[in-house]
Amino acid sequence: MKNLYVGLMSGTSRDSLDGCLVSFENGLNVLSCKTLNFSEGYQTSEDQAFISKEITDKSIELVNKLVETERQNVVAIAFPGQTISHNDNFSLQAGSPEIIAKQTKIPVYSDFRNFDIAKGGKGAPLIPAFHKYLLSEKETEKLVLNLSLIHISEPTRQSLI
């Protein structure tokens, strides 16, 4: 039995939702990636209720597309939600992990930002951990470029060892 995972992500620009189906057997294996665009009218903070519904619905649609032949092997979905507001002391995310879990019948892990803030972090715990994992392979040179509007980390070679 394979252990597969779905990772979802939407940027602060609120233009689309990206998803990947991956496994970590013998390193990172990206099995499939897909993108769904958001509606044009739901890109402002005033539309929070609509944003929450749309990110939930689009997440369900995207997960179902990613896992159509592998659903029985998917262990979990990582769903950070759509950032509505974020600073060092709090983060507000739109989207319903409970509905995504119920509709896809796959466990959903979410609210990473507030968990990180509660532990004294800046609310962006996943990317630095993923970069550390990705960059730990010493055989090849790698470069990571973060183009997000929320600064996550500036890893040094020493901090990754």
Task: State where each predicted segment sits.
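Secondary-structure boundary elements
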Residues: 68-69, 106-107, 136-143, 147
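Short glycine-rich, Thr/Ser-proximal phosphate-binding strand/loop in the N-terminal lobe
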Residues: 5-49
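Single conserved hydrophobic/aromatic residue that forms the stacking wall/gate
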Residues: 151-161
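Short beta-strand-loop/turn "lid" adjacent to the catalytic site in phosphate-handling enzymes
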Residues: 47-97
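Glycine/serine-rich anion-binding loops at beta->alpha junctions
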Residues: 8-15, 82, 93, 146
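Short, Lys/Arg-enriched, disordered terminal segments
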Residues: 1-3
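Active-site neighborhood for divalent-cation/phosphate handling
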Residues: 78, 82-138
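Short glycine-aspartate micro-motif
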Residues: 5-9, 74-78, 142-146
